[in-house]
């Protein structure tokens, strides 16, 4: 097959497309000839790591994905769960790591835009966004610039589009110096019986291009996301897409309108690999062929080649299969919204993917093989070495308890991230019940009493030290945060960020974390319904910390009965629920106070997580709990300080028990724990009920005053704590020493 004006296919050209020699040989055998330049680009896009999951697919099969409330699991644009009353929640999380490092503002904006499209492609109206951001060491010369650009990009897109950004994570670690992580999650609401899917159906059905015009931005974006970085990575700036939130808002409204009119047979957003991936997936999932005529594609630049049009990742675009009798009605709707509408092809019975341009056939490929016959690798992997348990008595504290608390709260890991989330509109739409800064966001479901509890969680240092326990803990933390606001955890989406899978130690981390995630999801009845894998997060051979971010969704039957972490009044008994051993391995205290980043992380007892969480949720629903907070990073005393600072009510705390050294008691990071306050009148009944179900519970103090006062220790004024807690990040971003 010879096409005019295309470069010859050479080994160098093949390599530049990210294809290994054996993969190219596979293409030659599949076609029985040399591919055209456009076909090479199509294979490069469909067979890269970002689109094909060729290194991860065999391991992803072990995740639990089913439950009675799951309508759609992995494999579609987003996951869908039933929340009753004919309503469904549609949600997913994806990464935009590589583009955000190269061009932080545009990389972040298009990450948000892409995940929003995944949600409304399914027929849902987006109601909330969350994100998890990982940056390098604050002292790295690029970190401040990257933080500024990414945060502005996330806020700029979400605010303009009109969806609240209600929660997230921000972390700093030197292992992200050369590869930041930008993980974006979107959540939407839809009618449970009106979910739209990507699979085309019917022969000779019109395939319609909708939305913004195609340009040269983003070409090879998916391929870039499937390779390591090096010192020249910033030269890849042209591969970063450019987003327009106002165009996306128009696209949302137009799509929802034609869905309501019954025009749509199948729909797929143009994300990674653009027109190529959307058309191939639509046809292959429907067991049909696709015939595209690129002469009909709306373009914003002159002289674009077939190769460029097929691989462009210009934003705010959709591909649909329409009912033929609804073409004119659909076109009128899109014209009304000022968006492009063009019939660019049709479905065919031949299971071929044919691309035409300027009178030439630029590509003629077997469509199923493009999608389902991508290389599948069971890459070598080695387990991470088992690290020793750190004995608390072997740790020499360098600071008093009070001094350590003040220092920890004024450091990057635990300081307030208000500077970040105040740049996001977290209340637009008027349905945000609990704002950022708590355990989980709570968003009201319109036209009823229900609410959604939303969170994103992961502790990468645990995953590095013990991938299996780290994977379990990421899920357990999401489950715990949803529980702490009164939500019933329903399902998760995951964003699996790892280094180069061709290194056995990295692949071992991936496999270990995935096994931990699967174990926790199974034990907690918390299925995975969508997700994303981002590999090759390395620069010059130095990989990120393994970061399997978990996005959790839970349901509250009555959002007015949600719990929050703030102490509500003086004189409330403070209860610690869960077992405390004083586990210091991989704790923030050990790392930031003792300068020791070592040891085994805390083990996660999933039975205890389930038992303790169910009890706490029951206390919230019964109206017994007046404040609730889970214990995680920084341990017990940090969690207590956060509760006190939230509303300016202090606490008088008992001394640590004699069996545990004080710094391990206050700063250990044992799992499956909650702090709950109750009215004095309910104390005896709470102890009785928890003892009956074998849930550990002790009283550790009383709320009151304006300081954190531990018996036998120096008291710490809340104003002093808040000053350090609130000032580190704005001071850092302002360049203050």
Swiss-Prot record:
Pathway: Purine metabolism; IMP biosynthesis via de novo pathway; 5-amino-1-(5-phospho-D-ribosyl)imidazole from N(2)-formyl-N(1)-(5-phospho-D-ribosyl)glycinamide: step 1/2. Substrate binds at residues 95-98, 117, 241, 313-315, 534. ATP binds at residues 53, 92, 494, 531. GO terms for cellular component: cytoplasm. Mg(2+) 2 binds at residues 118, 269. It catalyses: N(2)-formyl-N(1)-(5-phospho-beta-D-ribosyl)glycinamide + L-glutamine + ATP + H2O = 2-formamido-N(1)-(5-O-phospho-beta-D-ribosyl)acetamidine + L-glutamate + ADP + phosphate + H(+). CDD domains: PurL_repeat1, PurL_repeat2. Its EC number is 6.3.5.3. Pfam families: AIRS (PF00586), AIRS_C (PF02769), FGAR-AT_linker (PF18072). One of its GO terms (biological process) is 'de novo' IMP biosynthetic process. Keywords: ATP-binding, Cytoplasm, Ligase, Magnesium, Metal-binding, Nucleotide-binding, Purine biosynthesis. The active site is at 50, 96 (proton acceptor). GO terms for molecular function: ATP binding; magnesium ion binding; phosphoribosylformylglycinamidine synthase activity. It comes from the Bacteria. Mg(2+) 1 binds at residues 94, 532. SUPFAM superfamilies: PurM C-terminal domain-like (SSF56042), PurM N-terminal domain-like (SSF55326). Part of the phosphoribosylformylglycinamidine synthase complex involved in the purines biosynthetic pathway. Catalyzes the ATP-dependent conversion of formylglycinamide ribonucleotide (FGAR) and glutamine to yield formylglycinamidine ribonucleotide (FGAM) and glutamate. The FGAM synthase complex is composed of three subunits. PurQ produces an ammonia molecule by converting glutamine to glutamate. PurL transfers the ammonia molecule to FGAR to form FGAM in an ATP-dependent manner. Belongs to the FGAMS family. This is Phosphoribosylformylglycinamidine synthase subunit PurL. The gene is purL.
């Amino acid at each position: 097959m010879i096409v005019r004006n295309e470069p010859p296919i050479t080994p160098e050209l093949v390599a530049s497309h990210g294809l290994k020699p054996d993969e190219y040989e596979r293409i030659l055998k599949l076609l029985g000839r040399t591919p055209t330049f456009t076909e090479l680009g199509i294979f490069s896009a469909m067979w890269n790591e970002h689109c094909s999951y060729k290194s991860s697919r065999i391991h992803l099969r072990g995740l639990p994905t089913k439950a009675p409330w799951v309508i759609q699991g992995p494999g579609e644009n987003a996951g869908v769960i039933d929340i009753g009353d004919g309503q469904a929640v549609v949600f997913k999380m994806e990464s935009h790591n590589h583009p955000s490092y190269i061009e932080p503002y545009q990389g972040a904006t298009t990450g948000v835009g892409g995940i929003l499209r995944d949600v409304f492609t399914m027929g849902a109206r987006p109601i909330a966004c969350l994100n998890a951001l990982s940056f390098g060491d604050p002292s790295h010369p690029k970190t401040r610039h990257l933080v500024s650009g990414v945060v502005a990009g996330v806020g700029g897109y979400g605010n303009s589009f009109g969806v609240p950004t209600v929660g997230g994570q921000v972390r700093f670690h030197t292992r992200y110096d050369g590869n930041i992580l930008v993980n974006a999650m979107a959540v939407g609401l839809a009618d449970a019986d009106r979910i739209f899917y990507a699979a085309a159906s019917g022969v000779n059905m019109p395939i319609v291009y909708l939305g913004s015009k195609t340009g040269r931005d983003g070409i090879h974006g998916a391929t870039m996301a499937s390779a390591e970085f090096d010192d020249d990575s910033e030269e890849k700036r042209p591969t970063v897409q450019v987003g327009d939130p106002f165009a996306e808002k128009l696209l949302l409204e137009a799509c929802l309108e034609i869905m309501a009119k019954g025009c749509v047979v199948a729909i797929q957003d143009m994300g990674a690999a653009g027109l190529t991936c959307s058309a191939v997936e639509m046809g292959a999932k429907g067991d049909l062929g696709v015939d595209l005529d690129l002469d009909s594609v709306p373009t914003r630049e002159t002289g674009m080649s077939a190769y460029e049009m097929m691989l462009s990742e210009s934003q705010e675009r959709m591909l649909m299969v329409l009912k033929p009798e609804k073409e004119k009605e659909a076109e009128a709707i899109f014209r009304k919204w000022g968006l492009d509408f063009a019939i660019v092809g049709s479905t065919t019975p031949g299971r071929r993917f044919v691309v035409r341009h300027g009178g030439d056939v630029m590509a003629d490929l077997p469509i199923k093989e493009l999608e389902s016959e991508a290389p599948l690798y069971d890459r070598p992997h080695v387990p991470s070495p088992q690290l020793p348990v750190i004995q608390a008595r072997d740790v020499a504290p360098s600071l008093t308890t009070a001094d350590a608390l003040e220092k920890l709260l004024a450091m990057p890991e635990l300081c307030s991230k208000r500077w970040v989330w105040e740049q996001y509109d977290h209340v637009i739409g008027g349905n945000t019940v609990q704002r950022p800064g708590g355990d989980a966001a709570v968003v009201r479901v319109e036209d009823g009493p229900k609410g959604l509890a939303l969170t994103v969680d992961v502790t990468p240092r645990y995953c590095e030290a013990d991938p299996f326990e780290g994977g379990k803990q990421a899920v357990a933390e999401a489950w715990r945060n949803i529980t702490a606001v009164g939500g019933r955890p329903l399902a998760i989406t995951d964003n699996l960020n790892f280094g180069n899978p061709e290194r056995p130690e990295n692949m071992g981390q991936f496999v270990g974390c995935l096994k931990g995630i699967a174990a926790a999801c199974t034990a907690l009845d918390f299925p995975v319904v969508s997700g994303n894998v981002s590999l090759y997060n390395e620069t010059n051979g130095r990989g990120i910390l393994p970061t399997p971010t978990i996005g959790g969704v839970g349901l509250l039957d009555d959002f007015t009965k949600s719990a929050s972490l703030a102490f509500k009044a003086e004189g409330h008994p403070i209860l610690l629920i869960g077992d405390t051993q004083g586990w210091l391995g991989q704790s923030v205290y050990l790392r930031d106070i003792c300068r020791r980043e070592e040891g085994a992380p805390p083990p996660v007892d999933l039975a205890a997580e389930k038992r303790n969480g169910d009890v706490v949720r029951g206390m919230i629903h019964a109206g017994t709990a007046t404040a609730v907070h889970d214990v995680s990073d920084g341990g017990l005393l940090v969690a207590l300080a956060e509760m006190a600072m939230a509303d300016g009510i202090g606490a008088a705390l008992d001394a640590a028990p004699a069996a545990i050294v004080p710094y391990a008691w206050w700063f250990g990071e044992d799992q499956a724990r909650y702090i709950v306050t109750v009215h004095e009148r309910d104390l005896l009944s709470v102890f009785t009920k928890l003892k009956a179900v074998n849930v550990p519970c002790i009283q550790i103090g009383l709320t009151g005053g304006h300081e954190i006062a531990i018996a036998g220790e120096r008291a710490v004024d809340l104003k002093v704590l808040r000053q350090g807690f609130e000032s580190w990040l704005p001071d850092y971003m302002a360049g203050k020493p």
